Amino acid sequence: MDRRELCVRFAAELWLFLPPRDRHADLRIPYDGTSSLGHVVESAGVPLPEVGSLLVDGRPVTPSYRPVTADPIHVLAVRRPQQVPSSRFVLDVHLGTLARRLRLVGVDVAYRNDLDDDALIAQANTDERVLLTQDRGLLRRRGLWLGAYVRGARPDDQFRDVLDRFAPPLAPWTRCTACNGMLSPVGKAEVEKLLLPGTRRSYDTFARCLTCGRVYWHGAHGSHLDEIVDKASRIVAAQSENAT
């Protein structure tokens, strides 16, 4: 092997971050002899929050480790379900549908469609929320408390990926999908003036957001939402069993 190269084996789960030409078992990466292993991994395209372990000759090392070119290096993906200090999240501006679905099942999700990258990182750090994004550059920003790349182009796939990765505690029908506030049961008489005539005639059970005042009921789309909740419960239950 050329002494100026490292032989790095990335776990297959991380190949999506690599250029297509580099998606194979052993990758030869030019090395200047001084950079940290974390820098080498990120330069190859893999954000460090997606890395579960770094192994050099079978031994775990930290991202600050400076490798010797003869050492075989293995980069492993985060193990699922990932254990995190907090099951609270903040989502970037492109994941609005995912935010609403997570709130539907009771996950604490901060989301605004007008925050720039600096504001997202500040909120993640201040509130100790896991930043969920599909912006790889954002995950490579220094000082980010904790982040994760969301896999999938469709909201269904993104939803499944987040639940599979974190297996957060679920509490369906307890959060406002619009603002993340908590819902509280409310008598029909208290909200009757806010309802359309058809809704007043057809439904009797309501809840209201304690933050924004939005009123909820199990309406025409209720069966579809029930399916989403049931699917989420199955995914989290399966992952919780895997963790024990």
PLM features: what roles do these ranges have?
Residues 1-88:
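Ubiquitin-like/PB1-type beta-grasp interaction modules and other compact soluble beta-rich domains
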Residues 12-15, 93-97, 133-138:
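Short, polar loop motifs at secondary-structure junctions
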Residues 64, 193-206:
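Short linker/helix segments within small regulatory modules
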Residues 78, 82-105, 223-236:
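Extended interfacial segments that mediate partner engagement and assembly in macromolecular machines
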Residues 115-129, 138-139:
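BRCT (BRCA1 C-terminal) domain core and associated BRCT-interaction motifs
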Residues 170-174, 201-204:
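Flanking scaffold residues of small Cys/His-coordinated metal-binding clusters
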Residues 176-179, 209-212:
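Short cysteine-rich clusters marking metal-coordination/redox-active sites
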Residues 181-185, 217:
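Short functional micro-motifs and their immediate structural scaffolds
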